């Protein structure tokens, strides 16, 4: 089975479980809490190469890995998240954790009617331009938009917006390439 399909399947199962759990005072929902915990655990794992070596080593037993995770995160994560981590270890899916977290975040955002957009521009956008672009994206999608920004001077001018599997390319670089193709087709 492909890695992405495995990550989606586990993320969907966890999302379903978290969706059914009781709402907690500090959080709007258990989904919010689990999402926050998954991101925190993922950050700890990504930033600690020794921990990665232990978790991903095939000769270290599942029990040893679960004990390690339990010691690291006891009292810091919910039973839902702790049980999920144990399940991943039992099923030898711990190497999929980062991808599962990303898929869970997508599901949580979809449940909140939020879409993420990555905006790349040739130069840094000012606050007014960011606000204008965000309003346009909200109008186009009908959803709340979480936007991240990056600068790529090779675009020459304009912006490229990525939302899921959709790309809106308004860069001068692409327009010039298109014009070049049309001119070459004429000659």
Curated annotation (Swiss-Prot):
It is found in: Cell membrane. It is a peripheral membrane protein. InterPro entries: ATP_synth_OSCP/delta_N_sf (IPR026015), ATPase_OSCP/d_CS (IPR020781), ATPase_OSCP/dsu (IPR000711). Keywords: ATP synthesis, Cell membrane, CF(1), Hydrogen ion transport, Ion transport, Membrane, Transport. Pfam families: OSCP. GO terms for molecular function: proton-transporting ATP synthase activity, rotational mechanism. It comes from the Bacteria. GO terms for cellular component: plasma membrane; proton-transporting ATP synthase complex. Its main location: membrane. PROSITE patterns: ATPASE_DELTA. The keyword Signal does not apply. Belongs to the ATPase delta chain family. F-type ATPases have 2 components, F(1) - the catalytic core - and F(0) - the membrane proton channel. F(1) has five subunits: alpha(3), beta(3), gamma(1), delta(1), epsilon(1). F(0) has three main subunits: a(1), b(2) and c(10-14). The alpha and beta chains form an alternating ring which encloses part of the gamma chain. F(1) is attached to F(0) by a central stalk formed by the gamma and epsilon chains, while a peripheral stalk is formed by the delta and b chains. F(1)F(0) ATP synthase produces ATP from ADP in the presence of a proton or sodium gradient. F-type ATPases consist of two structural domains, F(1) containing the extramembraneous catalytic core and F(0) containing the membrane proton channel, linked together by a central stalk and a peripheral stalk. During catalysis, ATP synthesis in the catalytic domain of F(1) is coupled via a rotary mechanism of the central stalk subunits to proton translocation. This is ATP synthase subunit delta. It comes from Pelotomaculum thermopropionicum (strain DSM 13744 / JCM 10971 / SI). The gene is atpH.
């Amino acid at each position: 089975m492909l890695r992405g399909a495995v990550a989606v399947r586990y993320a969907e199962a966890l999302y379903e479980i978290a969706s059914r759990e009781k709402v907690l005072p500090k959080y709007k929902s258990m989904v919010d809490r689990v999402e926050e915990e998954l991101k925190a655990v993922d950050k700890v794992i990504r930033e600690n190469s020794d921990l990665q070596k232990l978790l991903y080593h095939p000769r270290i037993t599942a029990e040893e890995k679960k004990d390690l995770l339990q010691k690291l995160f006891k009292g810091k994560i919910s039973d839902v998240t702790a049980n999920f981590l144990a399940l991943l270890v039992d099923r030898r899916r711990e190497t999929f954790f980062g991808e599962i977290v990303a898929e869970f975040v997508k599901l949580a955002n979809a449940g909140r009617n939020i879409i993420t957009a990555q905006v790349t521009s040739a130069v840094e956008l000012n606050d007014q331009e960011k606000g204008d672009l965000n309003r346009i994206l909200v109008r186009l999608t009908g959803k709340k938009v979480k936007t991240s920004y990056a600068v790529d001077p090779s675009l020459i001018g304009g912006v490229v917006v990525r939302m899921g599997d959709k790309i809106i390319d308004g860069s001068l670089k692409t327009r010039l390439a298109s014009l070049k193709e049309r001119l070459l087709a004429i000659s």
